[in-house]
Amino acid sequence: MFDLGWTELLVIGVVALIVVGPKDLPKLFRNVGRFVGKARGMAREFSRAMEDAADEAGVSDIQKTFKTATNPMGSAMDSVKQATRDLTDSIDPTKFDPESETGKLAADRAENAKKIQAATARAAADRMAREAAEAAAKAEEAEAALSATPASTASSDSETKA
């Protein structure tokens, strides 16, 4: 909003500490925080009111029409996405009659899909556990090598001094 970096904020904080003093500084920051919060709330409320007014006036419909006119490829993709959504909604297994053959098959498919998802999740968890164990083993090897290295360098240092 004000495009202030950390260094600018630090300078402002130091100046505020000098001007206000350490005793009243927390109160000042609290009041500034409240003010900023209220200002953001008012800005959000204003934006929401403007969007509501635009929706009531039909600006969003006009905007959609302009978008369609200026970007025919995007509007075609939007219609494809909408058709896909409609198709997936129509295939939803919960919408079939559970007593019909289609409903029974859909329920079986949904159950099998859940089993597959559970097996996949279990396999992923096993793989992650295996990788974590391998990483821990590598870390232990590295620590062992690291602890062995100073001892060998210390003995070589004593040999060079003698």
Swiss-Prot record:
Residues 83-111, 124-141 have a biased composition (Basic and acidic residues). GO terms for molecular function: protein transmembrane transporter activity. This is Sec-independent protein translocase protein TatB. Part of the twin-arginine translocation (Tat) system that transports large folded proteins containing a characteristic twin-arginine motif in their signal peptide across membranes. Together with TatC, TatB is part of a receptor directly interacting with Tat signal peptides. TatB may form an oligomeric binding site that transiently accommodates folded Tat precursor proteins before their translocation. It comes from Ruegeria sp. (strain TM1040). Keywords: Cell inner membrane, Cell membrane, Membrane, Protein transport, Translocation, Transmembrane, Transmembrane helix, Transport. The gene is tatB. The keyword Cell membrane applies. It is found in: Cell inner membrane.
